[in-house]
A protein has these predicted regions:
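Divalent metal-cofactor coordination and adjacent catalytic microenvironments
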Residues: 1-176
Length: 176
């Protein structure tokens, strides 16, 4: 069955599966120096990458505020999400009927990354610190892990929430 890409438009769709569509991706990658993976992909692969990027962003990030509509499929739109760029020193919130441009751009960036490599799979040698062949000695580094969400996408998303760290022992608190 072919994927039908349904972009979240800020209304809290119950069937949305992406924060961006292929036209958004084309506009984002128009000024991107390393856009070849995106431009070479078929429309079907672009849409699949956008849907997967959206799923990964929703799974890996805990955004501030709450879903604007309890029945909506995705994390955005949100109510009460702080926007540090909104009202200068006073702060402000993202409108609860919109998906921020940075979230759309992070989705496009992640889609391009996914067209290059499956970021959910461990790369060859991940975690290997050293390996000696003579009398076989191997050492591992638990910190040597490629993040699922690229550093560029993380930078775009971080002002709206935080990356969920597994087994971190910390709880995110929000004042109301």
């Amino acid at each position: 069955m072919a994927l039908t890409l349904i972009k979240e438009d800020g209304t809290g769709k119950v069937d949305a599966n992406a924060y961006a569509n292929a036209a958004d991706g084309a506009a984002y990658h128009d000024g991107h120096l390393f856009a070849s993976a995106w431009t070479a992909a078929t429309l079907a692969n672009k849409e699949t990458a956008l849907a997967m990027a959206t799923r990964l962003i929703d799974a890996e990030y805990q955004f501030d505020g709450v879903k604007a509509n309890e029945a909506q499929a995705l994390q955005w739109p949100r109510a009460g999400c702080h926007d540090p760029d909104a009202d200068g020193w006073n702060g402000g919130t993202v409108a609860d009927n919109t998906v921020p441009k940075a979230v759309m751009e992070a989705t496009c960036e992640m889609a391009r990354e996914l067209l290059i490599v499956d970021r959910t799979a461990a790369p060859v040698g991940e975690g290997l610190k050293y390996y000696n062949d003579g009398s076989v000695q191997t050492g591992y580094d638990k910190g040597d892990r490629r993040p699922v969400i690229s550093h560029v996408a993380q930078a775009l998303l971080m002002k709206f929430g935080s990356l969920v760290k597994s087994k971190s022992g910390a709880v995110r608190l929000t004042r109301t």
